[in-house]
Amino acid sequence: MRRYLPTAHALVLTAAAAWVTAFAALSVLRQKAFFTGRFDMGNMVQAVWSTAHGHPLRMTDLHGDQISRLAAHVDPILVVFAPLWWIWPSPDLLLLVQALGVGLGALPVFWLARKHVGSPRAALGLACAYLLYPATEWLALNEFHPVALATPLLLLAFWYLDEGRLLPFGVAAVAASLCKEDIAFVVAGFGVWYALGRRRRIAGGVIAALGLAWGTVAITVVIPHFNEGQSSDFYGRYSEVGGSPRGIVETAFTHPLRLVEAAFSGRDLHYLWQLAMPLALVFLLAPLVLVAAVPELAINLLSAATTQTSIHFHYTAGLIAPLVAAAVLGAARLRRWAVPVAAVVLLAALLGNYRLGPIPGWRHVPGGQAFQATAARVTRHDGIAERALRLIPTDAVVSATNSLGAHLSARRRFLSFPFVQDATWIAADETQPGYADRYAPLPTALQLVWLRRNPEWRLVFEQDGILVFRRVA
């Protein structure tokens, strides 16, 4: 009797399905454990909820103003979630779609590797390396960000471009560019690779030009239009190197060393090593593909925000696709040793995951990554918080601390505590402040003292540090 052996394609589908199941479960558990927050999970929930209720991409900003999501980031792909929200109105919907999308990115990696490396087994190894790549896994767990969907879309776009199928490439590239304003620059980099690496100069030039044009329009026209004529609020992160795209260009000519110092600090070099080591540096053998990673690297390395030079956040979304695609084409340069090279990359990804990845089980292994290892653990405190939040009507204007915000943002107005303004309900967690809450501990504490003494507010719930107030006058 003939023994059945699964094909490499079947195995990569199985690996992707297992990965999606695991990371969808981890994402939902982190949400139930209140490890997500108003920033950024709640922002996305409110934008999707508003769209589903006839107010496209409306949300409440930090100061209590009702604005368009496009005033902060050009990620209109959020609109696609509105019909899904009608069917399943839950933040879990966004988390599951994100895990599914990122996991399916393994398929274009497999197709690309099978074509160029010439070995289905090697292609399977490289696809699994993508799934084990620490930046990929942290991306899937960093709350919900539409830009995470750009990673699989960019991989799909690169596959179609490599095949010379420009129409489906265009569809995937446009979809990716709708995930965030700077993703268009990655698409432009793909155009440069296509023009020089595939000698399709006209088509590649058009792709590069369109990518640059849309990215520039999104940043300099769309965001200011929805931001009351003001430039992006995130320019402050680049104040040391010019404070704007134009200022950065001027700094490059007037004080070039300032850019070098900003982009290659010890923190930045550590970030680059965390991106490079789990791919065994094989991507260096395909330098033209790496052109697509340059804009995103510049955006992250020049920023003063430490989150942008950490693989734990979503800022790697535009980097993963060109780095992994370059690793595949780099491995193809060593086609004669395809299986051993793929094995080395897979081993590097596994070791990188052990040292840097988010899999909770690593904390039980000596030297394994322990950062956020218990983030998916739902505690008694979380159950108390969930019970407290059920007291708040779904149509009420709420002010809440960041750690509770992701569970309360599916409404027209949501205020970030300690801002109160027109709120009729307030929810706060005194014992477990979320990431954003730590920026203003004193105003938060003072506001809670004021609420306890104010006769206009009644404390209707207090247990284990969870407080819920209702306006009575």
PLM ranges: what are they?
Residues L13-A17, R121, A208-L212, L334-R363:
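Signature aromatic-anchored transmembrane alpha helix within multi-pass, membrane-resident enzymes
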Residues A123-L132, A173, S177:
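Short helix- or helix-capping micro-motifs
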Residues R3, V186-L212:
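Perimembrane helix-loop-helix junctions
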Residues L149, L155-P168, A195-R198:
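Membrane-interface transmembrane helices that cradle and orient dolichyl/undecaprenyl
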Residues M1-A25, R114, P120, I202-V206:
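Start-transfer (signal-anchor) and selected internal transmembrane alpha helices
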Residues D92-V117:
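Transmembrane-helix motifs of polytopic, lipid-linked glycan transferases
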Residues A22, L26, S50-T51, R200-F283, ...:
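Membrane-lumen/periplasm interface segments of specific transmembrane helices
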Residues V291-R336:
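Hydrophobic/aromatic-rich transmembrane helices and adjacent perimembrane loops
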